[in-house]
Amino acid sequence: MTARQIVISIPEKVLLAEKTDEESFAREMRMLAAVKLYELGRLSSGRAADLADMFRIEFLMALGRYKIFPFESELKDLEGGNA
């Protein structure tokens, strides 16, 4: 899969307030973007997982941390090996 790089300027104050380093903050931003785009229906769970740099099942399981619950049938399909 080819990837494109997008550069976003983050004020130093934000990193200090979050008490995190650039790499961790970037990883969290990718996850948050993936979750929101999935929630809005703009990305499928597979594409959102790609954005978050995760396997699809990992992404679906992680959604609960953000109070987003994927369709039960989607999880059952994955557990049954129909992904």
Question: Language-model segments: what does each one mean?
Answer:
Residues 1-83:
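Small, basic N-terminal interaction modules of short regulatory proteins
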